[in-house]
From Swiss-Prot:
Signal peptide: none annotated. Homodimer. Its EC number is 5.4.99.12. Formation of pseudouridine at positions 38, 39 and 40 in the anticodon stem and loop of transfer RNAs. GO terms for biological process: tRNA pseudouridine synthesis. This is tRNA pseudouridine synthase A. Belongs to the tRNA pseudouridine synthase TruA family. One of its GO terms (molecular function) is tRNA pseudouridine(38-40) synthase activity. Substrate binds at residue 111. InterPro entries: PsdUridine_synth_cat_dom_sf (IPR020103), PsdUridine_synth_TruA (IPR001406), PsdUridine_synth_TruA_a/b_dom (IPR020097), PsdUridine_synth_TruA_C (IPR020095), TruA/RsuA/RluB/E/F_N (IPR020094). The gene is truA. It catalyses: uridine(38/39/40) in tRNA = pseudouridine(38/39/40) in tRNA. NCBIfam families: hisT_truA (TIGR00071). The active site is at 52 (nucleophile). The lineage of its organism: Bacteria, Thermotogati, Thermotogota, Thermotogae, Thermotogales.
Length: 245
């Protein structure tokens, strides 16, 4: 029995997050249902990240044991895509070592967050960007991210229900202005706490609006208190973009 990994993209709009749950539609659920139709047995998958309700993915990585050694990786990809709904797509399948685990063996996770700052709403993008019709000072936001890069206790930027070790490493945060008033916030790190990226984005927007000075980010981080930070940016602007391993 060989082990394979698959790079998956999905539109998170109509899912209750990635992780499988009873009685609701999840990304893991539809993937494992598709694999069961292909292999006539339940196949359990592991993923590099568990995205929340409404969050999208360009490069989610999953792994599973394939019970049919005669199928090529291209056969598996084609069979999965033939059995998956239109809002999930397998971009690539490849073999990995038998002990490979996407959650633990990934060395970098990259998230993208999109903010549309135009005064007019774009109804076609409403599920895929955060429409925020205010001018943002990107230079101030770029100064603020320097306080977040590196290894820190990110208690101020996690949800209260996340009991994991709050110490995380952010390798880099980039803020880019794209065309048509679209702002991209790219966050690179080894691993993240629940809603950590969205909470960071909300805090950066405070800086961009000049409600906070860039130095406020250091104060919030050192407070180690969720109530010291801003709110949470909407889920639909966030994309699990890519992993490296």
């Amino acid at each position: 029995m060989k082990r394979v990994a698959a790079v998956i993209e999905y539109d998170g709009s109509n899912f209750f997050g990635y992780q499988g749950q009873p009685d609701v539609r999840t990304v893991q659920g539809v993937i494992e249902d598709a694999l069961e139709r292909i292999f006539k047995q339940r196949i359990y998958t592991q993923a590099a990240g568990r995205t929340d309700t409404g969050v999208h993915a360009n490069g989610q990585l999953i792994a599973f044991n394939c019970p049919n050694d005669r199928m090529t990786t291209e056969d598996i990809r084609n069979a999965m895509n033939a059995n998956l709904p239109d809002d999930v797509y397998v971009k690539e399948v490849f073999e990995v070592p038998v002990n490979f685990h996407p959650r633990f063996d990934v060395t970098k996770r990259i998230y993208h967050y999109f903010i549309l700052t135009s005064r007019q709403k774009n109804v076609f993008l409403r599920k895929y960007v955060w429409w925020f019709p205010y001018e943002l000072d990107l230079d101030a936001m770029r100064k603020a991210v320097k306080y977040l890069e590196g290894t820190h206790d990110f208690t101020s930027f996690k949800t209260g229900s996340d009991e994991r070790d709050p110490v995380r490493t952010i390798y880099r945060i980039r803020i880019l202005r794209l065309k048509n008033d679209l702002v991209l916030i790219r966050v690179e790190g080894r691993s993240f706490l629940r809603r950590m990226v969205r909470n960071i984005v909300a805090a950066l927007v405070k800086v961009g609006l000049k409600q906070w000075e860039p130095e406020k980010m250091k104060e919030v981080l050192e407070a180690r208190d969720r109530s010291a930070a801003a709110g949470t940016a909407p889920a639909h602007g966030l994309y699990f973009y890519k992993v490296l391993f």
